[in-house]
């Protein structure tokens, strides 16, 4: 499975940084691409701001070179949730979005479009 993220395809709609950026405004940070499995792709997109938790990230994908983008589930918004499983894991989620594109075809190259918005 090959993943292709073209810089012009990853877009973030966020206010221009300046001295008076609202704490409610989302500021995109590092985008982490998880190692692909045979049929899934995973993403983590760290952010700053969005104190009102109303930002979102829409996800679309297509086979490399195909014309039509197909919608996937949006990334999940996380900020400060405790993730706990007995003695195996205990962490507080950072300010971020995370999610996956599921049920892909093995041996196929995909393009993924992530669009961040903050009303």
Where are these regions (language model features)?
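Short beta-strand segments of immunoglobulin-like
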Residues: 30-34
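Beta-strand-rich extracellular modules
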Residues: 115-119
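Structural beta-strand segments of beta-rich domains
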Residues: 39-43
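Proline/serine/threonine-rich low-complexity linkers at boundaries of modular beta-sandwich domains
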Residues: 15-25
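Bacterial N-terminal signal peptides
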Residues: 1-8
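Short amphipathic, basic-aromatic surface patches that mediate peripheral association
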Residues: 46-49
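Recognizes extended acidic, P/S/T-rich segments that occur
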Residues: 58-107
């Amino acid at each position: 499975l090959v993943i292709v993220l073209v810089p012009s395809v990853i877009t973030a709609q966020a206010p221009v940084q300046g001295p008076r950026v609202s704490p409610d405004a989302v500021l995109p940070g590092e985008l982490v691409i998880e190692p692909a499995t045979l049929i899934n792709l995973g993403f983590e997109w760290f952010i700053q701001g969005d104190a009102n938790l109303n930002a979102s990230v829409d996800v679309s994908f297509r086979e490399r070179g195909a014309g039509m983008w197909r919608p996937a589930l949006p990334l999940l918004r996380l900020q400060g949730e405790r993730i706990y499983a007995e003695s195996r894991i205990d962490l507080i989620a950072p300010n971020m979005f995370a999610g996956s594109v599921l049920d892909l075809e093995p041996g196929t190259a995909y393009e993924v479009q992530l669009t961040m918005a903050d009303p």
